[in-house]
Amino acid sequence: MSEINFDIVIQGGGPVGLACAAWCLQKFPEAKIALLDRNPVDDADLATADSRGIALSHGSKLLLDTINAWPTECADIHRVHVSQAGRFGRALMTREELKQDALGHIIRYRDIHLTLRKALRAIQTNSPNFFWKHIDTQTNTSDLQAKCVVHA
C-alpha cells in the first residue's frame, strides 16, 4: 500500500469505532475516512459473538438514532440506585423523577455491534472516500497518515 492521507483514521471496529465512523460519514460524506477493523468481514462470523449486556445512556440512544443504528431488542432502565455497602449516603434516580421514558438501556453487545455494522454499510454508500479495512496482526498500516486519529 502506498502512502495514503486521510482526514480521519479510526482504529477499532467495535461499537465506538463503528458509531464514530457512521456519524462522521453522515455529517461529512466527502471526508476521507478510514476505519481499521480487526473483526471478521462477514457478519455471520459475529453471530455467536459476545452476548453480554452493556448499559447505554439515553444520550447514546439519541446519537445512535441519528445514524439509524438502534437495535430492536433492548431493556429500558427505569431506576438507578448507587450506594456503597456499609457507607453513609446513596443516590437514587427514577425515570419519572427526571421525566424520561428511560434513564438508559441494556443491550447485548453482539446486537449493537451488528446493528452498527449494518448502519455503517448503508451510510457509506453516499461516501466515496470511505475506506473500511479489515486488518490482522500482519497488516502494515504504517503508511497511513491522518489529520485526526481516533483510538476506539
Name each region found by the language model.
Residues 9, 32-34, 81, 131:
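A structural signal for isolated positions on well-ordered beta-strands in alpha/beta enzyme cores
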Residues 31, 71, 128-130:
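A structural micro-motif
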Residues 11, 23-52:
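Glycine-rich FAD pyrophosphate-binding loop
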Residues 2-16, 34:
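Beta1/beta-strand and adjacent pyrophosphate-binding region of the FAD-binding site
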